[in-house]
């Protein structure tokens, strides 16, 4: 299942009227508003673009108070749902800002705070070099290990494996490192701005995979340009959360 939409910087004011700003989740409302207010008119290569992403994440994090590191699974938490998330290139913590925290808020709006174990991918530098290599090897191995940990420690949880940008490469790589039984046990996979868009996930039913790729997102064709369309996947987290908990 794939969603796409043509988005350009010049259309953002119009898009803002259509974004889900009337949701009950005030954190998500605030985040989307701040994102639109601070979204850069960007058309940069990876090295320059990631610097801008880091600056944008800093602004969004300070204004919204978004949590950038989660280690619930490592702390022994077993909830009904477990989100294991890999952040995008140049993002902070183990969870990032642009997609990870908004996705958490949308999920918690459905299952409550007690219904969700939240875990970011560790040992993952989220560097440009990692993206160009097809996804950081250490981060990929850590995500595979986290999924295996959830499978053994919390067999009744419903795992949502998710990532943004290079984080999607991490998801693809990690699932490829799992045995067939563990991979097929994953409840849902949700990918935002996937450089490997169109590549099947080993031993995961395609009906359980949802990919968001904006038409104007060069990263979704494994490119090396950062454009505004790559920075606004927070607008999709409500429908993503509905899918992930279905």
Residue ranges of each PLM-predicted region?
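Extracellular/periplasmic catalytic domains that process cell-envelope and extracellular macromolecules
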Residues: 75-78, 112-113, 153-154, 163, ...
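Active-site regions of enzymes building and remodeling cell-envelope glycoconjugates
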Residues: 204-214
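Active-site catalytic motif of lipid deacylating hydrolases and related acyltransferases
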Residues: 23-156, 214-235, 241-244
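Conserved hydrolase catalytic core segment
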Residues: 174-186
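Active-site nucleophile loop of the alpha/beta-hydrolase fold
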Residues: 188-198, 214-216
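Gly/Ala-rich beta-loop-alpha elbow adjacent to hydrolase catalytic centers
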Residues: 161-167, 171
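Fungal secretory targeting signals
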Residues: 1-26, 246
């Amino acid at each position: 299942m794939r969603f796409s939409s043509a988005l350009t910087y010049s259309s953002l004011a119009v898009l803002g009227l259509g974004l889900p700003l009337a949701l009950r989740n005030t954190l998500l409302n605030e985040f989307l508003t701040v994102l639109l207010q601070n979204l850069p008119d960007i058309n940069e290569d990876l090295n320059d673009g990631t610097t801008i992403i880091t600056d944008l994440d800093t602004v969004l994090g300070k204004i919204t108070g978004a949590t950038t590191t989660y280690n619930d699974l490592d702390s022994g938490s077993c909830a009904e749902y477990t989100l294991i998330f890999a952040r995008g290139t140049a993002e902070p913590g183990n969870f990032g800002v642009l997609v990870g925290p908004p996705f958490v808020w949308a999920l918690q709006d459905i299952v409550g705070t007690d219904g969700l174990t939240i875990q970011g991918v560790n040992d993952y530098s989220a560097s440009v070099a990692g993206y160009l290599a097809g996804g950081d090897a250490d981060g990929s191995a850590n995500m595979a290990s986290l999924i295996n940990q959830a499978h053994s420690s919390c067999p009744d949880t419903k795992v949502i494996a998710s990532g943004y940008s290079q984080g999607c490469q991490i998801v693809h790589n990690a699932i490829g490192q799992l045995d067939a039984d563990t991979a097929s046990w994953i409840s849902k996979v949700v990918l935002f701005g996937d450089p490997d868009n169109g590549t099947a996930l080993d031993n995961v039913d395609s009906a359980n995979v949802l990919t968001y790729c904006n038409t104007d997102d060069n990263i979704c064709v494994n490119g090396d340009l950062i454009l505004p369309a790559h920075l606004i996947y927070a607008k999709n987290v409500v429908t993503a959360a509905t899918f992930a908990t279905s």
